[in-house]
Amino acid sequence: MKEDQVVAEEPGFQDEEESLFQDIDLLQKHGINVADIKKLKSVGICTIKGIQMTTRRALCNVKGLSEAKVDKIKEAANKLIEPGFLTAFEYSEKRKMVFHITTGSQEFDKLLGGGIESMAITEAFGEFRTGKTQLSHTLCVTAQLPGAGGYPGGKIIFIDTENTFRPDRLRDIADRFNVDHDAVLDNVLYARAYTSEHQMELLDYVAAKFHEEAGIFKLLIIDSIMALFRVDFSGRGELAERQQKLAQMLSRLQKISEEYNVAVFVTNQMTADPGATMTFQADPKKPIGGHILAHASTTRISLRKGRGELRIAKIYDSPEMPENEATFAITAGGIGDAKE
């Protein structure tokens, strides 16, 4: 496959990827038996880093792993991984692995500092018809194209919670970028999630797939992240449980994005904010998911309608980009620049 060759040509990129995907089978050399390794893989833990990212308590909940075994596994994993501290310079070198996926609009990319970032969760929220699903579909195509900074392009996993995924839309967008329809559709793995639990289970499959084809997958899209939680947990009585389950899922997403160096893009809905009328806010709506989702998302983008097919994206929260706005258009070929 073409992506393999591109990645293989860059020795620096390859070394970094190697150290990123230390296979869990390496534990055999440190006295962990194959049966126990299989148990870890069954819950989506496929790398040494994955063990480091999982608490002892969570590992003890894996069927067939006793506390003594978990201690032994943790000890073996710690021998294989370097200690946790780096200088800021070393970390900045490590950050060079981070890539950006273009949104299809130069203005929008500029707003995001290059596009949708890997090793991070980017959340786009807005009312209906603000371009969230169109952006998801456009990213399915642009993530496959070679991009800036030696980005080789790669495959995508799309988890659909609202039945809004349309392969025909990808064909239209592929035409704009002059890419073969079948090749584009072949590189997108699609799954429909029916409940919030099912959504969580799919993430185990995602982790296994990312590990199996290390370095090939570049993007995970969930459209939309909160829809099923809204249905499965209704009313204030279930809010605490909903937020707890949501926190677990977002933590899993963060780990997947860092462990496999992929970009995670999620869309979110809006809700009326009953407290906003007291403070005379111009727009008394807010994204759902509360503080838990707000803290888990690395970059949050607010989308709103402009004139006609124009939409306005605003940085709502970002660790490095200033609060700013960009105007983009929804075209037949997906997200594009607004024509004056």
Swiss-Prot record:
Q: What is this protein called?
A: Meiotic recombination protein DMC1/LIM15 homolog
| Residues engaged in binding ssDNA | 230, 233, 236, 242, 311
Q: Where does ATP bind?
A: 126-133
Q: List the disulfide bonds.
A: none
Q: What does the UniProt keyword field contain?
A: ATP-binding, Cell cycle, Chromosome, DNA-binding, Meiosis, Nucleotide-binding, Nucleus
Task: Kindly indicate whether the keyword DNA-binding belongs to this entry.
Answer: yes
User: What would changing residue 233 to A do, according to UniProt?
Assistant: Abolishes binding to ssDNA
Residues recorded as binding dsDNA, renumbered to this chain, are 230, 236, 242
- What's one Pfam family the UniProt record gives for this protein? HHH_5
Q: Which organism is it from?
A: Homo sapiens (Human)
Say what the protein does: Participates in meiotic recombination, specifically in homologous strand assimilation, which is required for the resolution of meiotic double-strand breaks.
Q: Which Gene Ontology biological process is one annotated for this entry?
A: meiotic cell cycle
Name the principal localization, coarsely classed: nucleus
Q: Could you describe the subunit structure of this protein?
A: Double stacked ring-shaped homooctamer. Interacts with BRCA2. Interacts with the MND1-PSMC3IP heterodimer. Interacts with RAD51AP1; the interaction is direct and stimulates DMC1-mediated homologous recombination.
Give the UniProt entry's GO cellular component terms: chromosome; chromosome, telomeric region; condensed nuclear chromosome; lateral element; nucleoplasm; nucleus; site of double-strand break
Protein family membership: Belongs to the RecA family. DMC1 subfamily.
Localization per record: Nucleus; Chromosome
Taxonomic classification, please?
Eukaryota, Metazoa, Chordata, Craniata, Vertebrata
Recorded hits in SMART domains, A to Z, give: AAA
**Gene Ontology molecular function terms on file:** ATP binding; ATP hydrolysis activity; ATP-dependent activity, acting on DNA; ATP-dependent DNA damage sensor activity; DNA binding; DNA strand exchange activity; double-stranded DNA binding; identical protein binding
